[in-house]
């Protein structure tokens, strides 16, 4: 009897173990599958997960930037690659980890759960939501963390006053598209944008990126939003090397126009070439910066200054060339004050050599003293009597010949003096042109240096202050 009872107990234990054994070896995947089926049985993703009608879902919002792709000054756009950190609580997605093998979190497709419709308000390409619907992390207490990546083109008002030493303040405003503040509230996860994985941009540097919560009212409703402000600083090395330095070189080439001699036409040729080069630079800048009538960019002001500078240099060069080619033959006599100022005083002030090619030649007498004495003696002899009449006739012939020679010498002398006077006038005007060149050289050099300093100093001061 005892043996039968023992056998019966053994069979019962084996049967019980056979029935209970599968429940002890349930895999984690099966448990997670059971959890998902239990959680989403009857779950409606279009319904806001609240218990009471006056409950508000608080969404903790944060931003992480990975790349500043582009800042388009022409179209007022900023292109960024970011991650949107969103965290909220869904009471319908809670479970007890002990009932499901200690599972504390699961990953579910974001398309299957309720999502706060947070979008970028200043979007410029029509893509207001994140570009990729990634999975969301759901914890056992109902906390949901969703960090979708997104590529945004946001509108940004550009201030190019100090281009290329400018800074830009671009903002990204996020908020719910349909829910007001009584339904969905936004709070900042962090006051700063996460830049730990930021990939540096070759043209722009992010000085600061902070977030701030705000709210706008529309009638009786209040709509909370979060604004992230990016302070961007341009790295001006490229524009300095390929834009500003060539412009500086062209401005100083304009100054060197007044160092060239006026005999040839290189002065006008150089000035015209500089003006054409500046026009090309202006067209290049026009393709970069936005077309705005509110402000003139710094580099645009400088190019405009140089173009006016070059235009004046061309006008002055024409005047100097005109002075250089003046003479008595062109009916331009030199006034006494011009001689005194430009031939004597200004050359000393400008450290120039004096005008030494100006000589005074004594007048040649019509008759030399010896000729006068010979003629006087001949006249006395002819008056004293008739002796030596033949000799006297010979002397008179020589006297007549000498008088003709004297008249010829006088004619040659007058011609030489006239040529010398013309040459002297020509040289005087050429020297006046040289003095004018030296004056305008210093004037334009001073104006170029002062203009460059006055235009770029405010921008450099602002750029170097941080």
UniProtKB/Swiss-Prot annotation:
Name by which UniProt lists this protein: Neuronal acetylcholine receptor subunit non-alpha-3
Main location per the UniProt record: membrane
Oxidoreductase recorded as keyword: no
Glycan-linked positions: 54, 141, 169, 208
Membrane-spanning intervals of the chain: 236-260, 268-285, 302-323, 439-456
Protein family per UniProt: Belongs to the ligand-gated ion channel (TC 1.A.9) family. Acetylcholine receptor (TC 1.A.9.1) subfamily.
Signal peptide interval: 1-28
Gene Ontology terms, MF aspect: acetylcholine-gated monoatomic cation-selective channel activity; transmembrane signaling receptor activity
Source superkingdom: Eukaryota
Disulfide cross-links: 156-170
Segments in the Extracellular topological domain: 29-235
Expression tissues: Retina, tectum and brain.
Record text on subunit structure and interactions: Neuronal AChR seems to be composed of two different type of subunits: alpha and non-alpha (beta).
PROSITE patterns to which the protein is assigned, alphabetical: NEUROTR_ION_CHANNEL
UniProt topology in membrane: Multi-pass membrane protein
A Gene Ontology term for the protein's cellular component: postsynaptic membrane
Topology feature Cytoplasmic, residues: 324-438
Keywords linked to the UniProt accession: Cell membrane, Disulfide bond, Glycoprotein, Ion channel, Ion transport, Ligand-gated ion channel, Membrane, Postsynaptic cell membrane, Receptor, Signal, Synapse, Transmembrane, Transmembrane helix, Transport
Cell compartment(s), UniProt: Postsynaptic cell membrane; Cell membrane
Organism: Carassius auratus
The protein's role, per its UniProt record: After binding acetylcholine, the AChR responds by an extensive change in conformation that affects all subunits and leads to opening of an ion-conducting channel across the plasma membrane.
